[in-house]
Amino acid sequence: MTISSLSAGVSARRNSLNNVDFLEISFSKPRRKCTRLPCGLNVRQAVHVVRLLATCRRDLRRRTLAYAIPNENDEAKKAASHDCNLDTMALHLDNNASSKYSDVEVVASISCLEDDISQSIENLKSQGSILDKLKAVHLHLLASERWNASRLKLCHRHYSDSARNLIHYLALRCLDLEQLKEDLSCTSLLNLESINSYILASLTAGIQLLDNQKSSSLNTQESILYQEENGNFMIQALGKKLSANKELLLGPLRHNQTNHIMVTVGQEASESEISDILKAGASIIRINCAHGNPSIWSEIIRRVKTSSQMLEMPCQILMDLAGPKLRTGNLKPGPCIIKISPKKNATGNVILPSQVWLSHKDAGPPPSHLSPDAVLFIDDKKFLSELQVGHILKFSDARGKKRMLKISRQFHFFSGTGFVAECSRTAYVQSGTELHRKGKKIRFPAAQVVDVPAVEPFIRLRVGDLLTISRDSSCEQDESSEPISSAHRITCSSSCLFDSVKPGEPIAFDDGKIWGLIQGASISEIVVSITHAGPRGTKLGSGKSINIPKSNIHFEGLTTKDLMDLEFVASHADMVGISFVRDSCDIAMLRKELEKRKVQNLGVVLKIETKSGFERLPHILLEAMKSSNPLGVMIARGDLAVECGWERLADMQEEILSICGAAHVPVIWATQVLESLVKFGVPTRAEITDVASARRSVRTSWPVAFRLKIDEATSASEILRASCVMLNKGKHVVEAVSTLDKILHINTAQMKADLMKPLLPSSHFF
C-alpha cells in the first residue's frame, strides 16, 4: 500500500510537555524506520504515515493518538484512534471523547490511498501473535536444552553457560523464523540476527516487554521491571563472556586497541625485525611447526621474548602443529647462487643500479628499513672494517664475467657494520666468489662470499601438462633446468593420498593455484592432467599443499610428529594450533594428550580448514569445552576455500563467526590478509575492504528499557566479529602490520561524523 500524499501536523501545547515525551511517526512501508520527534516542536512536513504514536512519562506504553483514512469523496477524515497495546484499549480523539487528551491537537489530511488503510493498521497491531510466537520459540529452546542435558553436564564449569547458549543458537537455527523476523523488525522490538551471544535472555526480555504492554497495573509493571533487571544481569554476564574468553586466550589488549594482530615469523626473522613488528602493533607471534625443528623454534622464541621485554610489550606465542596435511615432497636443491640484476627501461638501458647489502656472516640480515635487491655475507671482518664509502670491489661472477660493486652507504648497528653497494650490470654470485678491493698500486687481500642460499627448486606447470606424483623419494626430478617435455614428477610421502583418490577426481596444489584431474592411480603413483594454471604456467615447489576435496580421505587426528612437537609446545608456547580438525574424535584425542602433560592453561586454537570440520563445528566446540583450556577458533581460509569451493567461502566464514559468537569463543581470522602488501609493498583495494570486514560489528536492536545495560555489557552495543587478525610473513610485513593496525582501530564513529559535517547546513533540523 502506498500513500501519494499525506500531510500531518501535530502541535503540543505547553501544558502537555510534562506528560508527552515523544511523538513517533510510523510509515506505511514496514521496513522504513520510524521517526521520533521531541515534543514541543511544530511539525508541518509532508510525510507518508499510517499512525502517530505518543509516549508519556506517566505511562511507558505507547498509544496511537490519531490516524487518517479517506471517505468516499476522498476527503480527509479523522478516525478513532486505537491503542497499540495488546488489550486494544481505545483512545477516541473525536469531538465527543477527547477530554482526557485535550492537550494534544492532531491535524491530518489525505488526498489519495490505493488500498484500504484499515488492513494495514490491523497488520501493525499484531503484537499478540508475536508474543505467542516468541513464547513458542522460548519453549523450543528450553526443550532443546533438556534434550542435550547429558551433553551439557560434561562441559567444564567455565564453559557451561556458553555451551547452553550454543545449544540455544542451534535450536533457533532449526526453525523457520523469517516471518517472525519480519514482524519483530516492523515493531523495532528485537533483531534475531544480533542476539547470538545471549539468545534465551534476549527472548525473555522481548517476552517480558510484550507482557508489560498487556498490563496497565502499576504494581504489575513494577514487578515486571524487577524481573527485567534480573534478566539484564544475565545478559550482562553473557555479554562479557566473550571478552573474558578472548583475554584468557589471546592476552590483554594494548591501549586503544580493539582486537589483536598475529604475525607468522620464521627463522629468517631477526631480533630487530621482531621488535619492529611488535612496535607496529602485533601482539601475538605464530610459529608453524611444519617448518624447522625445536632448535630453530627455541631461537625464534628467545628473540621474541627478548624483544617483548625490551619494549615492555606483552606478546603471546602460538605454535601450529603441522597436522596430517598433504604436501609435495622435496625437489633436489638447485645451485647456491644469487642473481643481481639492475632495473632497466623498455629499451634495456639501466635506470637504477641494483642495491646489494654487504656484511659479516654473523651480523644477521640488514636493518628492516632497508630493502636491498640482494644480500651477500663476507667471511673476513678485517676486510669489511677497512671499507669506506666510494670504494670499488671487483669480482668475476659464476659465468666468468667481470663485474664491480661500488660502496654507496655505510651502517653501524649493535651486531656489526654493514654496507650498501651498487651494481650496474647483471651478475650471478655464488659461494666462494672472491671480492677484490680496487687500488691504484697496492693489492689488497681478497674476501670470499659465503652462505649463498640454494636456489629454491620448482617445476612450472601449464594447462595440459601431465604430473606424476610418486610415493618413492628416489624418483625426485632434478629441476636445475626445466624439462622441455610436458611430463613432470614430484613426490608425496603420505600414504593417505595414494589410498584415497580415484580416477576422475579433482586435485589442487598450493592453495588452489594449480588444479588437475586424476587420470590414473596406483599404490605408488598418481598421474594428474593439469586443468588450471597461469597463462605462462605456475610454479610448484617443495612443501606445497595438496587438496583432494572430492575424495574420501581418512586422517588421523594427531600425527606422530604432532605428538613429538606437542612436548616442546606445551613447555614453550602460550597457545597450540590444531590443524585440519575434522570431528570431535580429534579433540578427544587432544584432550587426553593435554591431560597427560597436565597443561590446563595452554590455549587451544582449532583450525577450521576442511569441509567436515566446518559441518561438525558445534560438536567439535562442545567436545573442546569439556576441558578448562582457553579455547579459540582459526578460520584458515586458504584450505577451506579449496576444500569447499570459492563461491561458498564468504557464507561459511559468516557461519563460523556466528557459531563461535554463540559459544563465546574468540575467532582468529587468517590466510592471505593484505597479502599483496606483505609481499610487494602495495595493497589491493579488495584487500583493504577485506580487512575492514574483520572489524565489522553487529549493532543489536533492543527495546529502550533494556538498551542501556546491554550497551554496558557489550561496549556500546558493538561486538567485534574477529578477535584477532593474522598476517603471514613477507618482505613488507612491518608495513603491513602498521597498516592493519590503523584499519582495525580507526575511530569509525568520529570519521563518519567528520564526513557528514559539510553536508549539514545547520545543527537545528526544525
What is the predicted role of each segment?
Residues 2-12, 21-24, 29, 40, ...:
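Non-catalytic helical/linker scaffolds that mediate oligomerization, partner binding
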